[in-house]
Amino acid sequence: MAEPDYIEDDNPELIRPQKLINPVKTSRNHQDLHRELLMNQKRGLAPQNKPELQKVMEKRRRDQVIKQKEEEAQKKKSDLEIELLKRQQKLEQLELEKQKLQEEQENAPEFVKVKGNLRRTGQEVAQAQES
């Protein structure tokens, strides 16, 4: 390889170029990181660069396994647990029906409420006369 001209000339007025310092090589943190990446690469622990589709498929498989385990756990419920769940559902249904009736009564027009009151008072008067 040809040597540059400024090496042969010993002219003190010339500014001689100096080799640039590589900041990557001088940085201790970067050297440690590079060494760690090389070691992981040799061991096969390199960061996984999986395509997005593969990641989604793995996530779906994990979700599917979790769902299957939950279903198996539900299938293995004892008779007592099943009976308790049935009773709880019945109570919830009764409570919902009760709330619906209350809402219907509250939302009913005024004349329907008055008519119901008149019937009750009429029945009470009839019962009082019979006794």
Curated annotation (Swiss-Prot):
GO biological process, one term: sensory perception of sound
Basic and acidic residues compositional bias, start-end: 52-78
Keyword Acetylation: yes
Modified residues (N6-acetyllysine): 50
Record's keyword annotation contains Coiled coil: yes
InterPro entries according to UniProt: FAM107
Coiled-coil region: 61-112
Region (Disordered): 39-78, 100-131
Residue numbers of N-acetylalanine PTMs: 2
Family per record: Belongs to the FAM107 family.
Name of the protein described by the UniProt record: Protein FAM107B
Gene field: Fam107b
